[in-house]
Curated annotation (Swiss-Prot):
It is found in: Nucleus. InterPro entries: A-crystallin/Hsp20_dom, ARI3A/B/C, ARID_dom, ARID_dom_sf, HSP20-like_chaperone. Residues 142-233 form the ARID domain. The keyword Magnesium does not apply. It comes from the Eukaryota. This is AT-rich interactive domain-containing protein 5. One of its GO terms (biological process) is regulation of transcription by RNA polymerase II. Residues 25-37, 43-54, 78-90 have a biased composition (Basic and acidic residues). The gene is ARID5. One of its GO terms (cellular component) is nucleus. Residues 1-120, 237-274 are annotated as: Disordered.
Length: 434
């Protein structure tokens, strides 16, 4: 039988009332019989709840405790100490119920297991690694979609922002899929600058009737997820590598494309002006008007004839300035006779006008090049206009034609000039015979 160990004195706080009872002789006898002897002296120091949370103080009523656990105490294999629960002492001297089992955790320790920092970031960003992207659907499981929506709702609520889950054609939109698709491409700024919203929207397989895919999904993201993205990026929880360089490259690409298209447009305009100037010089020498050709684009044949008449009148008005002459000349427009030789070509329009020194012929031969139109004249006052397309099976339905214009007076064929300009416009100046 082991000798009694002397109890060590401990400082008891002044505000604590209570007495720790000394074990009885019967309890000492039972302890000495049930547990084996240990070469290390047993530590029977009594402690209070205010000093140490984990204690080895003996239980006041050891007999009842042994009966509850089957008459056996757990023995520590290293030093033979008995694992017993602490006895709580109340401020009024009474004792609370003593329980056996594991000791309470230290104050300040979390009750839940520690979560690694990497998993916390992944939970907040909801992104998939490369390995997960090959195995897991980007749309996410239904429980993941619901958890993501709750996370975004909580964020908006904390920041006093209005949030309403978007719906696409009456069905709730998968915001988790939209979030992963945009962040995977580099974030909102990159997707907007690079004009990738249609690519994002097409991944949702919109119906054919949806003609505003880019605008629709951009608005969805701006209203539901843009502030959430900004928050994560500002706090460093969301890192988008290459997001700073992509917009600049996209802007440079866009600027270069605009510059290239602008330069091409400039070249085309310059070429049109140069050709127009060339025709104007040629036509001024032969008597044709200098009205820009582009203005007549897209008009039907009848307005073209009227415009041609008006153009000629204006030109004559600038040269002579006599209104009486115009009215007299307008009466002479029907003096010339136009006859079809062979199959009639109604799509060829010819208008003849007589001035004080010549006949002016305005003709429309659309679809024919300069090499495909021939003009012949003789002193008797006859002019032949013939067209021969190189490809007879052309898609425009142009067929060979020949028209003869009979003038009421003799003409000078040596000084007759003809010019074919753009869009199949033919102008012929036929001077009177001197």
């Amino acid at each position: 039988m082991m000798a009694d160990t002397e109890m060590q004195e401990q400082d008891v706080p002044s505000g604590t009332k209570g007495v720790v009872e000394e074990p009885s002789e019967l309890e000492k006898d039972l302890n000495s019989i049930e547990r084996p002897k240990s070469p290390v002296p047993e530590d029977t120091t009594h402690t209070l709840d205010s000093d140490v949370h984990l204690s080895d103080a003996p239980i006041a009523n050891q007999i009842e405790a042994n009966e509850e656990v089957g008459g056996q105490n757990s023995v520590d294999g290293r030093n033979g100490d008995v694992d017993q629960s602490e006895k709580k002492i109340t401020s009024d001297g009474g004792q609370e119920e003593t329980t056996l089992g594991e000791s309470n955790p230290l104050k300040g320790d979390p009750s839940s297991p520690h979560v690694p920092e990497e998993s916390v970031k992944k939970w907040k960003t909801w992104l998939l690694s490369d390995a997960e992207a090959r195995e897991v659907d980007e749309a996410g499981a239904p429980q993941d979609q619901e958890a993501f929506i709750k996370e975004v709702e909580a964020f908006n609520k904390e920041n006093f922002l209005e949030f309403k889950a978007p719906k696409f054609y009456g069905q709730p939109l998968n915001c988790l899929k939209l979030w992963r698709a945009v962040i995977k491409l580099g974030g909102y700024d990159v997707v907007t600058t690079s004009k990738l919203w249609r690519q994002v929207g097409e991944s949702f397989h919109p119906p054919k009737t949806c003609t505003t895919v880019s605008w629709t999904f951009r608005i969805f993201y701006e209203k539901a997820l843009l502030e959430y993205e900004k928050h994560l990026r500002q706090n460093g929880e969301l890192n988008l590598p290459g997001s700073a360089s992509l917009p600049s490259s996209g802007i440079e690409k866009e600027a270069s494309s605009h510059q290239a298209s602008g330069s091409g447009r400039t070249r085309r305009d310059a070429a049109a002006r140069a050709m127009q100037g060339w025709h104007s010089q040629r036509l001024l020498g032969s008597g044709e008007v200098t009205e820009p050709i582009v203005k007549e684009k897209g008009l039907n044949s009848t307005p073209k004839q009227k415009n041609l008449k008006n153009i000629g009148v204006q030109k004559q008005k600038t040269t002579t300035g006599m209104d009486l002459v115009f009215s007299h000349e307008s009466e002479k427009q029907s003096t010339a006779e136009v006859i079809d030789v062979g199959p009639p070509a109604d799509w060829v329009k010819i208008n003849v006008r007589e001035t004080k020194d010549c006949f002016e012929i305005f003709a429309l031969v659309p679809g024919l090049l300069r090499e495909e139109v021939r003009v012949q004249s003789d002193p008797a006052g006859r002019l032949v206009i013939a067209g021969q397309p190189e490809q007879l099976d052309n898609p425009w339905g142009i067929t060979p034609f020949k028209k003869v214009v009979n003038f009421p007076a003799r003409i000078d064929p040596l000084h007759t000039s003809a010019v074919v300009s753009l869009h199949g416009r033919l102008f012929v100046r036929v001077p009177f015979e001197q």
